[in-house]
C-alpha cells in the first residue's frame, strides 16, 4: 500500500547563523534600530546585532572599533530562534555606554517604550524579557 502514496522529501537542514546581540544602554535607555523595509523581519525594531560570535573581549573590541564608548560590558543569556529556513543561535551582551553615539541610526527607548511603542520581533524575546524583568 505504501508504494501508492508519494514519499515526502526529507527536510534539508536549516541554515545556522551565529549572532551576537548587544543590549546597548545609555542613561537608563536602550538603543534600538529599525530593520530594513524588505527581507526577514522587515520594518520591525531590533537590538544591535552582528552575524558573528564573540567572546567578552572580542565583543568589547568590536564595539570600540565601531565608535561605541563602552563603560561596562557583561555577558548575557544565549538565545535561539527558529525560522522556517534559518536557525539563529545568539549570544548576548549587556553594554553600558559612556556616550550616546550621535548620527548612528539608533533610537533611545525606555523599558516602557520598548514594551508599548516599538515592535520587537519574537526572535529577540529572550533579550527583551531580560530588560523588562
Region roles according to the model:
Residues 1-133:
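Intrinsically disordered, low-complexity, charged terminal extensions of DNA damage-control enzymes
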Amino acid at each position: 500500500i505504501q508504494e501508492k502514496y508519494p514519499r515526502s522529501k526529507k527536510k534539508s537542514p536549516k541554515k545556522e547563523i551565529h549572532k551576537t546581540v548587544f543590549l546597548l544602554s545609555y542613561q537608563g535607555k536602550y538603543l534600538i534600530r529599525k530593520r530594513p523595509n524588505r527581507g526577514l523581519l522587515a520594518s520591525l525594531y531590533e537590538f544591535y546585532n552582528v552575524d558573528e560570535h564573540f567572546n567578552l573581549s572580542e565583543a568589547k573590541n568590536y564595539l570600540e572599533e565601531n565608535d561605541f564608548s563602552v563603560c561596562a560590558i557583561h555577558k548575557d543569556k544565549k538565545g535561539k530562534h527558529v525560522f522556517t529556513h534559518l536557525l539563529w543561535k545568539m549570544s548576548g551582551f549587556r553594554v553600558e555606554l559612556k556616550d550616546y553615539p550621535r548620527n548612528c541610526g539608533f533610537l533611545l527607548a525606555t523599558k516602557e517604550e520598548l514594551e508599548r511603542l516599538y515592535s520587537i520581533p519574537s526572535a529577540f524575546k529572550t533579550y527583551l524579557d531580560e530588560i523588562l524583568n
